[in-house]
């Protein structure tokens, strides 16, 4: 288990900056990220992914406005929405990782952001969405992406469930330790406060 955690950390530190796979890899080893030294690379990766996605959306809008001459920057096209959904989720991830503690919904946001990117790629490349941005000519090309999406969804949900179980065990253990420590403190003070016989003379 420790080897897998260290591998997840190395992927976060040494991976490519332009992919949402890095936050997902961090999610796989998120139960080890407890210090500020480990959380700082996470913030950098998520911000970098968010900036790349933002620049991509802006360049796509500029290209559509100047090259296609539609007379507007944004038309809520299905393909535009497919890129906008991961951007909204990535924005939520940025706000969630600012907190000093790791929460289950932070892990869930990272998982859903990556899965939305895969699902958006599948929708565009398979021709499932009818859009002027879609240049798919072969519907069978999306089969691989669909199976990859299902596989990653299953693995991510299993990891998320295991992490939630580990987090609940740690919270229960901490509560039990607090109660036990408080009980010991009360017993110690009670022992000190017990009446003791007073010696009026010495033998």
Swiss-Prot record:
<dbReference type="InterPro" id="IPR003569">
    <property type="entry name" value="Cyt_c_biogenesis_plant"/>
</dbReference>
<keyword id="KW-0999">Mitochondrion inner membrane</keyword>
<comment type="subunit">
    <text>Interacts with CCMFC, CCMFN1, CCMH and CYTC-1.</text>
</comment>
<dbReference type="InterPro" id="IPR003567">
    <property type="entry name" value="Cyt_c_biogenesis"/>
</dbReference>
<protein>
    <recommendedName>
        <fullName>Cytochrome c biogenesis CcmF N-terminal-like mitochondrial protein 2</fullName>
    </recommendedName>
</protein>
<dbReference type="GO" id="GO:0017004">
    <property type="term" value="P:cytochrome complex assembly"/>
</dbReference>
<keyword id="KW-0496">Mitochondrion</keyword>
<dbReference type="InterPro" id="IPR002541">
    <property type="entry name" value="Cyt_c_assembly"/>
</dbReference>
<feature type="transmembrane region" description="Helical">
    <location>
        <begin position="143"/>
        <end position="163"/>
    </location>
</feature>
<dbReference type="GO" id="GO:0005743">
    <property type="term" value="C:mitochondrial inner membrane"/>
</dbReference>
<comment type="similarity">
    <text>Belongs to the CcmF/CycK/Ccl1/NrfE/CcsA family.</text>
</comment>
<dbReference type="Pfam" id="PF01578">
    <property type="entry name" value="Cytochrom_C_asm"/>
</dbReference>
<comment type="function">
    <text>Forms a complex with CCMFC, CCMFN1 and CCMH that performs the assembly of heme with c-type apocytochromes in mitochondria.</text>
</comment>
<keyword id="KW-0472">Membrane</keyword>
<keyword id="KW-0812">Transmembrane</keyword>
<dbReference type="GO" id="GO:0015232">
    <property type="term" value="F:heme transmembrane transporter activity"/>
</dbReference>
<keyword id="KW-1133">Transmembrane helix</keyword>
<dbReference type="GO" id="GO:0020037">
    <property type="term" value="F:heme binding"/>
</dbReference>
<keyword id="KW-0201">Cytochrome c-type biogenesis</keyword>
<feature type="transmembrane region" description="Helical">
    <location>
        <begin position="44"/>
        <end position="64"/>
    </location>
</feature>
């Amino acid at each position: 288990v420790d080897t897998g955690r260290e591998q997840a950390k190395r992927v976060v530190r040494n991976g490519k900056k332009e992919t949402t796979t890095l936050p997902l890899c961090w999610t796989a080893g998120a139960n080890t990220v407890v210090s500020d030294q480990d959380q700082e690379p996470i913030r950098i990766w998520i911000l970098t992914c968010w900036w790349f996605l933002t620049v991509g959306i802006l360049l796509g809008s500029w290209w559509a406005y100047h090259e296609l001459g539609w007379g507007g920057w944004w038309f809520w096209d299905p393909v535009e929405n497919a890129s906008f959904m991961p951007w909204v989720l990535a924005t939520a991830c940025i706000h969630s990782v600012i907190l000093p503690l790791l929460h289950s919904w932070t892990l869930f946001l990272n998982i859903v952001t990556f899965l939305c990117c895969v699902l958006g790629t599948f929708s565009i490349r398979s021709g499932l969405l009818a859009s002027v941005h879609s240049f798919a000519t072969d519907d069978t090309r999306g089969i691989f992406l669909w199976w990859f999406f299902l596989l990653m969804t299953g693995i991510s949900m299993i990891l998320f469930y295991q992490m939630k179980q580990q987090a609940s065990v740690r919270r229960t253990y901490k509560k039990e330790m607090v109660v036990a420590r408080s009980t010991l403190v009360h017993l110690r003070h009670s022992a000190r406060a017990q009446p003791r016989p007073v010696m009026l003379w010495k033998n």
